[in-house]
Regions:
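Cytosolic nucleotide-utilizing catalytic cores of signal-transduction proteins
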Residues: 1-152
């Protein structure tokens, strides 16, 4: 039904006071609306909440994007496939929650199991969840995974 496929999204731009920034904020909002449309997300959204995905979409097909995809994401996906594990799900939960305890609870696993899996992720990718720059790298990996899964 065509009626069910309609997306109605509105984006709220961050506040600004300089008139010359209208174009910048308009373009940012349009990019976020395009992203929401591709994700089939309706409603009123703040542009700032979607900027990381919007920014990453502009980096698609760059050497940096492909490097993260091949050195982290592809390796973890291959490991999960080969051993029927859930390292990517665990990583996503750990990055999303406020604490490892909350992430373990969300995954219905013991905290030591979560720590073991984070160690396994480090072994496979050479990225340490407990090091800020590596954690950022791992977050980009999860964002790329979602973009690839959603075919954005």
């Amino acid at each position: 039904n065509k009626e069910q496929n309609k997306i109605a999204a509105a984006v709220i731009s961050p506040e600004f006071t300089e008139l010359e920034r209208i174009k910048e904020h308009y373009e940012m909002s349009v990019n976020v609306i395009r992203l929401l449309y591709k994700l089939h997300i309706s409603g009123v959204r703040k542009a700032e909440e979607w900027l990381p995905f919007s920014l990453l979409m502009h980096c698609r097909n760059t050497s940096e994007y492909n490097f993260i995809k091949t050195t982290v994401l592809d390796k973890l996906q291959e490991y999960d496939r080969r051993y029927q594990s859930s390292l990517l799900d665990t990583l996503s939960a750990a990055l999303r929650e406020n604490s490892l305890e909350d992430a373990a609870e969300r995954q219905h696993i013991h905290i030591n199991t979560l720590r073991y899996r984070l160690g396994k992720i480090k072994e496979i990718t050479q990225k340490n969840y407990f090091k800020m720059t590596d954690r950022y790298f791992l977050l980009l990996c999860i964002m790329i995974q979602r973009m690839e899964h959603e075919q954005l």
